[in-house]
């Protein structure tokens, strides 16, 4: 069993192209008790960030200009730094669920979010990831 403090100290990367979304997600995680949170609005930087920091969880928006979440996951898989992609994808398009899971995401959250669901999915994934 993983201690709760280990889960709240897990490293989390938030990826979204909109500053308001990044700030909201970061605030929710901070308010919940998470302490090691990194954010980026540059999806092209995710692979390099993950290879340097080995995040325990990546909270990834799917719909972003220039490079979408599917492309980010493809780059992460191709880099091979972590065979287990610790990705939860976020999107307003529930029809992308299967495609996202097939691309390597471990979980999927549809917009609009229920905050309790988001917190629970993040906690549960980190609990499994840190075993």
PLM region descriptions:
Residues 19-38:
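Two-component/phosphorelay signaling modules centered on CheY-like receiver
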Residues 16, 61:
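Active-site residues of response regulator receiver
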Residues 1-13, 26:
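Non-catalytic signal-transmission and effector/linker regions of two-component phosphorelay proteins
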Residues 39-57:
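Acidic, metal-coordinating helix/loop segments flanking the phosphotransfer/catalytic sites
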Residues 113-126:
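C-terminal output helix
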Residues 64:
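Receiver (REC) domain active-site loop signature in two-component systems and cognate sites
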């Amino acid at each position: 069993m993983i201690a709760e403090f280990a889960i709240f100290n897990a490293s989390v990367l938030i990826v979204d192209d909109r500053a308001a979304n990044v700030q909201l997600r970061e605030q929710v995680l901070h308010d919940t008790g998470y302490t090691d949170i990194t954010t980026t609005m540059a999806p092209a930087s995710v692979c390099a960030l993950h290879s340097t920091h080995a995040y325990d969880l990546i909270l990834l928006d799917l719909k972003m200009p220039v490079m979408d979440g599917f492309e980010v996951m493809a780059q992460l898989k191709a880099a091979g730094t972590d065979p287990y992609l610790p990705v939860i994808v976020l999107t307003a398009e529930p029809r992308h669920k299967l495609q996202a899971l097939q691309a390597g995401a471990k979980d999927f959250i549809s917009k609009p979010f229920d905050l309790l669901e988001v917190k629970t999915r993040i906690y549960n994934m980190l609990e499994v990831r840190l075993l």
